[in-house]
């Protein structure tokens, strides 16, 4: 027993990032040496499943508890967060238009993807998003509908604040703390989960996607990296007035890296909340803004929809005018905000955007098929960009408020001791 305790202590004594990198390397090596060891891949499935399973419960109890205690203050910070989420999503779509014009690509169309749930227009996408607000609360938790979870958690928390006994509020607070502890245990096992996810990806996909669709993939990933490393930091600098890169790299390292392998913004919500706690953010604030960001902060989705649509237009020889490109940017940004309410996410919103240029649904669905082929890389980078951005802008709004109040920013950001 002592030996086991020592092993656990040594494991916990190593930085989580170092452990994840070791797991990543081991997973890649195992995939090349023993590609038939399916049990390794199951570790990844278990990790993602655990995160997806606990995330809806975590969001509900934390938001409800914060409101029931009467300490939640959705002040100007919340408005700033929503503004930053929407602004960066639109800018991402606009930048995708610019890069597509600078580096136009055509593709070999794949077999059409099969789906019965392709949205017919922007109205349907936004209608689905609004309908999700009032979905059955139990169903919302079971299906991971975070718009619905947020709505009912707010209703429950406000009602509990009004009529709940003090002992009930304490129980709700203790429940939130208990769920948060479970999340910490799950995240502590991330190296094994990442090892399994890397193993599955390397052993099943290899490098084949880079040969046939390399240019399209390079354009998508390059645009997302430009957004993550240039545009978002510039916006953060405007609000913070100091070098944003320590925060950017920390969010990419501690949020984006995990999101890259889980390929799920929902699964990464617990990871992001743990990171917000480390950054010293207000729990009452980030408990709402992080789940909301997983729904509407969709820079990567806006880039994917825009570039894939313009690639389809280039393939068919359709000339896209500047006004049409601006309309596409707005449509992609709004559609991306509703991507979480559509089965298949950003890829199945491509036909909606293609309809702007009169591209047939058959061709649009072939582009969706291409998307699924390159998805192992495209979707990974997209999710990493989206998820890291959730924390970046929640922190930016919070630290901006600190500056206005004369409060010192964190030492890691300014390099000055407080």
Model-derived features with residue positions:
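Hydrophobic transmembrane alpha-helical segments of multi-pass transport and channel proteins
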Residues: 50, 86-90, 94, 221-225, ...
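Membrane-water interface of transmembrane alpha-helices in multipass transporters/channels
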Residues: 39-40, 75, 171, 207-215, ...
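Short amphipathic alpha-helical coupling elements at transmembrane boundaries
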Residues: 41-49, 139, 170-185, 247-258, ...
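Helix-loop-helix junctions within the multi-pass membrane cores of secondary transporters/permeases
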Residues: 254-336, 394, 407-415
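Signature of multi-pass transmembrane helix bundles
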Residues: 7-33, 48-51, 76-247, 407-413, ...
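Transmembrane alpha-helical segments and their short flanking loops
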Residues: 307-418
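Membrane-interface alpha-helices at helix entry/exit sites of multi-pass transporters
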Residues: 73-81, 181-188, 278-294, 322-323, ...
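Transmembrane helix boundary and interhelical junction motifs in multipass membrane proteins
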Residues: 58, 193, 264-272, 302-308, ...
């Amino acid at each position: 027993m002592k030996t086991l305790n020592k092993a656990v202590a040594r494991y916990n004594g190593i930085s989580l990032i170092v452990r994840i990198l070791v797991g990543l390397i081991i997973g890649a090596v195992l995939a090349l040496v023993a590609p038939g060891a399916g049990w390794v891949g199951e570790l990844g499935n278990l990790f993602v499943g655990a995160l997806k399973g606990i995330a809806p419960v975590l969001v509900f109890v934390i938001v409800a508890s914060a409101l029931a205690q009467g300490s939640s203050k959705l002040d100007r910070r919340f408005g700033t967060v929503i503004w930053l989420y929407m602004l960066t999503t639109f800018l991402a779509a606009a930048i995708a238009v610019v890069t597509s014009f600078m580096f136009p690509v055509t593709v070999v169309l794949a077999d059409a993807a099969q789906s019965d749930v392709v949205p017919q227009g922007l109205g349907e996408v936004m209608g689905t998003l609004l309908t999700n607000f009032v979905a059955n609360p139990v169903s919302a938790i079971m299906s991971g509908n975070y718009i619905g979870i947020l709505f009912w958690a707010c209703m429950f928390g406000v009602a509990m604040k009004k009529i709940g006994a003090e002992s009930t509020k304490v129980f709700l607070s203790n429940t939130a703390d208990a769920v948060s502890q479970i999340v910490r245990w799950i995240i502590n096992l991330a190296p094994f989960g990442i090892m399994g996810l890397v193993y599955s990806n390397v052993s099943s996909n290899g490098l084949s996607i880079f040969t046939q669709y390399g240019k399209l993939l390079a354009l998508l990933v390059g645009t997302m990296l430009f957004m993550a490393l240039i545009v978002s930091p510039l916006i953060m600098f405007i609000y913070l007035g100091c070098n944003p890169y320590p925060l950017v790299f920390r969010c990419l390292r501690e949020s984006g890296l995990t999101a890259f392998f889980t390929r799920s913004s929902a699964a990464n919500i617990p990871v992001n909340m743990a990171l917000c706690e480390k950054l010293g953010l207000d729990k009452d604030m980030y408990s709402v803004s992080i789940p909301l960001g997983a729904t509407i902060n969709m820079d990567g989705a806006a880039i994917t929809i825009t570039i894939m649509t313009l690639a389809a237009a280039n393939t068919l020889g359709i000339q896209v005018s500047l006004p049409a490109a601006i309309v596409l940017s707005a449509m992609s940004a709004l559609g991306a905000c509703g991507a979480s309410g559509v089965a298949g996410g950003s890829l199945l919103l491509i036909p909606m955007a293609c309809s702007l240029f009169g591209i047939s649904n058959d061709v649009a669905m072939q582009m969706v098929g291409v998307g699924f082929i390159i998805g192992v890389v495209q979707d990974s980078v997209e999710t990493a960009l989206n998820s890291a951005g959730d924390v970046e802008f929640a922190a930016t709004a919070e630290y901006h408020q600190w500056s206005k109040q004369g409060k010192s920013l964190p030492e890691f950001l300014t390099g000055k001791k407080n």
